[in-house]
Amino acid sequence: MNWLPEAEAEDDFKGLLSGDFFDDLINHLDVPLDDIDTTNGEGDWVDRFQDLEPPPMDMFPTLPSDLTSCGSGMAKAPRVDIQRNIPALKQSYSSEALSSTLHQSSAPPEIKVSKLFQSLSPVSVLENSYGSLSTHNNGSQRLAFPVKGMRSKRKRPTTLRLSYLFPSEPRKPEKSTPGKPESECYFSSEQHAKKKRKIHLTTRTVSSTLEASNSDGIVRKCTHCETTKTPQWREGPSGPKTLCNACGVRFRSGRLVPEYRPASSPTFIPAVHSNSHRKIIEMRRKDDEQFDSSMIRAVISRG
């Protein structure tokens, strides 16, 4: 069962595949004519379409009954005059193509170049790629390494001061009078410190004298030089705490002789006593020489 009569099909295809249509199509496509074989074109196309057959009816089981029953009605469909409509299509297509080409040629070259650079600018491509990479890297870093908040600055522990190890009475700052300058205040503080030192020394001497006195009220004296003031009492030939500090050191070293006296001793005589061991030896040698000379004179006088 054929869809269209053979004569009508041949006329329709011949009208569609006319020579003018192919020429117009080749001009618009800008294809070289050497690649197209125009010999025996119409005969080949007609032969190919004649070999075609309509599909079998088994492929359309749900086809409506009107189409299946009225096959003759479809064959009597009104014939469309394709050859008449083709020139109108050619004219409309050619007018549109000419208008588009004129519009493109009338455009200034600067706009074309700018559009070309806008579309194919390597800088924009690099910026877009760099932006996409940076956003990707930022996202990955945020996921892989979460940023912690700012750490609060801890106060450093203060160093231990000497005042904690050696507590002393806090010094009260001296109030400077409006009439006195700062230099006078500084000198007054130094004088005050010197006075404190003197008082401390006097109390020390008083304590040494108090230690020298016995419980019975008798003042202690050195058995060798008879001094009463000494920083420390030492052991002597008469017992403990019987010699002053200087005489006790000489007694321990074995150089305590009758000619030795400290300069602060009340019994010190420069012609007889000395606080230097070398001078004491010289004095003894002179005494021995004088004794020897006196003995020789006595023997000579007797003879």
UniProtKB/Swiss-Prot annotation:
GO terms for molecular function: DNA-binding transcription factor activity; sequence-specific DNA binding; zinc ion binding. Residues 131-189 are annotated as: Disordered. Coiled coil: none annotated. Residues 169-183 have a biased composition (Basic and acidic residues). Its main location: nucleus. Keywords: Activator, DNA-binding, Metal-binding, Nucleus, Transcription, Transcription regulation, Zinc, Zinc-finger. It is found in: Nucleus. GO terms for cellular component: nucleus. InterPro entries: GATA_TF (IPR051140), Znf_GATA (IPR000679), Znf_NHR/GATA (IPR013088). Pfam families: GATA. A zinc finger (GATA-type) spans 216-270. Residues 131-141 have a biased composition (Polar residues). Belongs to the type IV zinc-finger family. Class A subfamily. Transcriptional activator that specifically binds 5'-GATA-3' or 5'-GAT-3' motifs within gene promoters. May be involved in the regulation of some light-responsive genes. This is GATA transcription factor 11.
